[in-house]
Amino acid sequence: MMTFATQLNAAILRTGSVTCVGLDPRLEQLPKPLRDSVSEKRKDSVAAAYTQFCCEIIDAVAGLVPCVKPQAAFFEQLGPAGMVSLGEVISHANQAGLIVITDGKRNDIGSTATAYADAYLGSAEPDRSPWGSDALTVSPYLGRDSLEPFVEVCDRRAAGIFVLVKTSNPGGGYLQDLSVDGKTIYQSVAELVTELNKSRLDADGYGPVGAVVGATYPEQLVELRKAMPHSILLVPGFGAQGGSADDVRAAMDANGAGAVVNSSRHIVFAHKREEFSVAADESNWQDAVRAATIQMNEQLKG
């Protein structure tokens, strides 16, 4: 069974892209045809619009990018209908040949961590849950024993996790940059990530434990690429948050793989951007999504 890291790096090389399209549906920003389809903001109606929106994005970017990243929170806020929608979106992405990284930032210890992992990791039958994804973002705050249950499920299901190491938000440094015993917290987390990977490397030297490192901190991105040579990096903060193409190239290995760069708003709401003209009724919004994806691919190639 091909490991998660092997699958993702192969998809990067196959598509010639390191772009990860973030699926963050927001009702007020949906294209007009989808906003108009929502009945009195009923949650089941909003969920149906989210499913259609995300699935049409998937259809627009399939073959152009290696992966998509649905943000679980936007679906969870709709209750049961939203969770059904999330499952439908994940399944559609799998069927389209895209790797799915669910952004849930889960964490706990023992059996609860295993339950989270069972719910969100593994896209292959017979183990697949309704939300079974190829990878999941996780928090390291509870320590090593909170990550090990996720890694054990990754081993069984050829899945992956992305551990929050140095995040792109301005307030992340409040904890992540604290120094303890001569090392910052993010450096200690990076060491843990590398340790968890060491016995799990594929032929290219990558393990199932990836890391989230923000493009908004380019010096730390260079530092952490060296500190975690066995981890695929998930790099948020490109575009809307200010990270540049030059900044994020440092995350990639010599083959142009080893990292994926996330963009959500700049792609999925591209119909709102003046440079991508769409019809007045926004009926061709999918064209803007595709054009924005191609633009980002070209920017990252340099």
Curated annotation (Swiss-Prot):
Q: Which SUPFAM superfamilies match?
A: Ribulose-phoshate binding barrel (SSF51366)
Give, as in the UniProt entry, the pathway in which the protein acts: Pyrimidine metabolism; UMP biosynthesis via de novo pathway; UMP from orotate: step 2/2
The protein's gene is named: pyrF
* Active-site feature positions: K105
Q: What is the recorded name of this protein?
A: Orotidine 5'-phosphate decarboxylase
* Cystine pairs: none
The keyword Lyase is assigned to this record: yes
Q: Which UniProt keywords apply?
A: Decarboxylase, Lyase, Pyrimidine biosynthesis
Superkingdom of this protein's organism: Bacteria
Its UniProt entry gives the catalysed reaction(s) as: orotidine 5'-phosphate + H(+) = UMP + CO2
Provide the family line. Answer: Belongs to the OMP decarboxylase family. Type 2 subfamily.
Could you cite one Gene Ontology molecular function of this protein? Answer: orotidine-5'-phosphate decarboxylase activity
What would be one Pfam family of this protein?
A: OMPdecase
What species does this protein belong to? Rhodopirellula baltica (strain DSM 10527 / NCIMB 13988 / SH1)
Return the EC number. 4.1.1.23
Task: Name the InterPro entries on file.
Answer: Aldolase_TIM, OMPdecase_AS, OMPdecase_type-2, OMPdeCOase_dom, RibuloseP-bd_barrel
